[in-house]
Amino acid sequence: MQIAVTNLKGGTGKTTTAIYLACALSETGSTLLIDTDPQGSASLWAENAPELPFSTVAVPSPAVARQARDLAERYEHLVIDTPPGHPGITSAALTSVDLVVVPLTTGSVDLVRFGTTCELVEAAQAINPTLHGFALLTKTRANTASRRDVRAAIADAGMLPLLDAEIPLREAIAGAEGTLPTSLDAYSQVLDELNARTKGLTP
């Protein structure tokens, strides 16, 4: 599986999602995480937690497209953590993967920027027709009006399909930065749904 995690807005749980997905994927095969963010958040996380069960490399430039294709031959799974506010790097990353996950919270600002990110994904699909995109709600609280409103707004807008799986607001996840994640259940559910929803899909 080759996944890019992207959102042009920061603060949506993007790097956390990339790290957790890489951990979950590593349970089924060798996994590489490519950190394309010039801030190096994922690389710093990996540096502080050398026990992470996957490899990490930093490629904070549009060269990620070429390097990802080369590196993917050595690993069963690939996760690319893309930067906020760098559409050139993000676009390059999206040309080299099969899946893109766009994490967003239930905040109204996230929803506005979500549309811009979706446009970037659509442009990448014109170049990479095998690319399938999904939105993922993060930092959610069950049975809240904001959660229901965001789900309805995304469905009405007809943008990227929204995964049923969600990442709840939990201290174990929010405080995991720089450590080895210990509870992968929510992200394992994300992977299960991605596998189920992309099985048999054609570009």
Model-inferred region functions:
Residues Q2-L8, I19-S91, I127, P168, ...:
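P-loop/Walker-type NTP enzyme "switch/lid" segment
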Residues K14:
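Conserved lysine of the Walker
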Residues L32-L33, I80, V102, A135-L137:
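Structural beta-sheet core signal
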Residues P87-S108:
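Inter-motif core of Ras-like GTPase G domains
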Residues F114-T130, T138:
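Conserved C-terminal guanine-recognition region of P-loop GTPase G domains, centered on the G4
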Residues K139-R141, R151-L180:
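Beta-strand-loop-alpha "switch" segments that mediate conformational coupling across diverse proteins
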Residues G175-L194:
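C-terminal boundary of histidine-terminating zinc-finger modules
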